[in-house]
């Protein structure tokens, strides 16, 4: 193996880990050669009401697409996260919660969490929620967010969690698409010392003329902040659970019955509702959580992701709780009120496993390691990275400053659509290279293809595809199966197209190089460029807009917008700020453009297609080798854009 920046598995870790390198190779080989046998065995890791006999019926043929796992079995996700632990671990802490203000802390045992979920599940039923209904959840990072999700799962309702940073318009589009009858929110959330007006955002979202399905809004009293109230529609969480029974039988769900919807950005602009089902997802989330983090019973596990993202679903709620872990949930941000907060929390709660994002690591790195002078970190055993590729400098800083050079780092690659981790090191099995996601998890068959779909062998670079299904895979785009087929299975026939590019080195390790479609990755969160463009163009003074990502020291990718104003409109710094606020209001803070360049024209082909590759290079300040511009209707546009570019490194 090439020794360039190789971090070898220590003998001590390999000896005590769930799998070493030889075991990984043997298990991986079996999972590919005999997937039925492999998953027949590993599907038993969760509890089934009616055991499955049929394991896998899958096809990536775009004319005959089929994704079915454990498909004649029945189960309940909530029972797998709660009930099955009660006999032996009722008193084990399930959730440790620390508020935005560190003085606010709670501990909830598995027994207590079970009671809370049962009561709230009964409360949902009292508000008319039935099996198969879609419930929208827009909550702060409090234990009740997990309670709401598990209560939905308990009674067979499908939850659709919306990230608490999204705007009323973004909430409205998701409520409309899912036709939710019930919305669950809080008066406010707390983040970085600021109150987030969640209830007000819901009120504004529900004023949208196309929102016609919502009958009830359940409101958790988090801060006691003042909220508007609509009698007959709005109801307090606490008043509902006060009288609710502590007993709630679980709904028996088919393995392929929906568990949740989660909307993700697509390149067309309309967020797509990724639909995950129950059986395969629970098997895969719990198995990846155990093996990737080398989880041992009773360990304290902290995933810093928001519950509104897939990482919060799979690795803060379903995976860890199915495995009986103690999960730390933090309401705020781990670098507030100071960069020392992350280390303080690891020490305060004796965290064994940390799963966080490169954006946070880079932000802490920029503040300087002196903030970790008082940090002990001796409890920490495994560290993970998620959301985007981690640059080698940040990887090494994470390893040295947070991990004190003794914690293996699992740099995980996966997507909302995949349900769980697909490419990752395993702590006791994989020598790591900073910046590489390394090798596939069991049952995962990655390949690299050229633009014609030809499989590339050996050390090479190409489009990252997957050749066969895995249990955690999404099943469809809600209400638009054709879009599912078109997005993932039409580009390369017989393969799942990830939308990412990657290279494979001489050791077979994968290095994710980023999106190859029109989606940008801001602070580990996917945003469709079309969404941001649509928001800009909806402003009355904007005639046209093109949005691309560009390298950003902290966020990984920043948002760079080229804007053509309507005839006669004057360019000004005030208008630039107004447009930034406009996008923030339309989509959310995450989508705010970092740089807006005025453009008298955009590089277009004669058929009117915007040539984004030129815009990406100019935004990245790579202006010496732009490539052939002869297909452009007006090549002179390029020179003007280069002269007026904003991201110069002079």
From Swiss-Prot:
The modification N6-acetyllysine is found at residue 609. Its cofactor is Mg(2+). Mg(2+) binds at residues 537, 539, 542. ATP binds at residues 387-389, 411-416, 500, 515, 526. One of its GO terms (biological process) is acetyl-CoA biosynthetic process from acetate. CoA binds at residues 191-194, 311, 335, 523, 584. Signal peptide: none annotated. Catalyzes the conversion of acetate into acetyl-CoA (AcCoA), an essential intermediate at the junction of anabolic and catabolic pathways. AcsA undergoes a two-step reaction. In the first half reaction, AcsA combines acetate with ATP to form acetyl-adenylate (AcAMP) intermediate. In the second half reaction, it can then transfer the acetyl group from AcAMP to the sulfhydryl group of CoA, forming the product AcCoA. This is Acetyl-coenzyme A synthetase.
């Amino acid at each position: 193996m090439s020794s360039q920046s190789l971090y070898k598995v220590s003998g001590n870790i390999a000896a005590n880990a769930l799998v070493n390198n030889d075991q990984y190779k043997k298990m991986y080989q079996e999972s590919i050669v005999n997937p039925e046998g492999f998953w027949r065995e590993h599907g038993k890791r969760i509890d089934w009401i009616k055991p499955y006999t049929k394991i896998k019926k899958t096809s990536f043929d775009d004319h005959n697409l089929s994704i079915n796992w454990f498909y004649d079995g029945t189960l309940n996700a909530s029972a797998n996260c709660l009930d099955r632990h009660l006999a032996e671990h009722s008193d084990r802490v399930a959730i440790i919660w620390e508020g935005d203000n560190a003085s606010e802390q709670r501990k909830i045992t598995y027994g207590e969490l079970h009671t809370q979920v049962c009561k709230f599940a009964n409360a949902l039923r009292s508000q008319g929620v039935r099996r198969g209904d879609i419930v929208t959840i827009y909550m702060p990072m409090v234990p009740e967010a997990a309670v709401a999700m598990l209560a939905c799962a308990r009674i067979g309702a499908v939850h659709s969690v919306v990230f608490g940073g999204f705007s009323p318009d973004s909430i409205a589009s998701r409520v409309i698409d899912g036709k939710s009858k019930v919305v669950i929110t809080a008066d406010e959330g707390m983040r970085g010392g600021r109150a987030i007006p969640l209830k007000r955002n819901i009120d504004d979202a529900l004023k949208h003329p196309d929102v016609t399905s919502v009958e009830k809004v359940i409101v958790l009293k988090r801060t006691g902040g003042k909220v508007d109230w609509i009698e007959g529609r709005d109801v307090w969480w606490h008043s509902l659970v006060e009288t609710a029974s502590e007993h709630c039988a679980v709904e028996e769900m088919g393995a392929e019955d929906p568990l949740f919807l989660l909307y993700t950005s697509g390149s067309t602009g309309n967020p797509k509702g990724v639909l995950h089902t129950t059986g395969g997802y629970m098997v895969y989330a719990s198995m990846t959580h155990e093996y990737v983090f080398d989880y041992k019973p009773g360990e304290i596990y902290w995933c810093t992701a928001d519950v509104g993202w897939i990482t919060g679903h799979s690795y803060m709620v379903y995976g860890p709780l199915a495995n009986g872990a103690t999960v730390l949930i933090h309401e705020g941000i781990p670098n507030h009120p100071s960069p020392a907060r992350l280390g303080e929390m690891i020490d305060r709660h004796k965290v064994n496993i940390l799963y966080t994002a490169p954006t946070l690591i880079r932000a802490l790195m920029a503040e300087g390691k002196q903030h970790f002078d008082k940090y002990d970190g001796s409890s920490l055993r495994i560290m993970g990275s998620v959301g985007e590729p981690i640059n080698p400098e940040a990887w090494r800083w994470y390893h040295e400053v947070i991990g004190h050079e003794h914690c293996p780092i699992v740099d995980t690659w996966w997507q909302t659509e995949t349900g769980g981790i697909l490419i990752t090191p395993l702590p006791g099995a994989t020598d790591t290279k900073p910046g590489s996601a390394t090798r596939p998890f069991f049952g995962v068959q990655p390949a690299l293809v050229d633009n014609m779909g030809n499989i590339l062998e050996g050390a090479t670079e190409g489009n990252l595809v997957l050749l066969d299904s895995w249990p955690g895979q999404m099943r469809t785009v809600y209400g638009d199966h054709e879009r599912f087929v078109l997005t993932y299975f039409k580009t390369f026939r017989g393969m799942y197209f990830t939308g990412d590019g990657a290279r494979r080195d001489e050791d077979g390790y994968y290095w994710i190089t980023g999106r190859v479609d029109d989606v940008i990755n801001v602070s580990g969160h996917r945003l469709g460029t079309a969404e941001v463009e649509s928001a800009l163009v909806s402003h009355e003074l904007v005639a046209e807009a093109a949005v691309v990502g560009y390298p950003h020291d902290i966020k990984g990718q920043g948002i760079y917008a080229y804007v053509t104003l309507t005839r006669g409109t004057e360019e000004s710094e005030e208008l630039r700020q107004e447009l930034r606020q406009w996008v923030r209001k339309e989509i959310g803070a995450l989508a705010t453009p970092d740089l807006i360049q005025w453009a008298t024209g955009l590089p277009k082909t004669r058929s009117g297609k915007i040539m984004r590759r030129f815009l990406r290079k100019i935004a990245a300040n790579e202006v010496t080798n732009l490539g052939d511009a002869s297909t452009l209707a007006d090549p002179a546009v390029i020179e003007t854009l280069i002269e007026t570019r904003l991201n110069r490194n002079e």
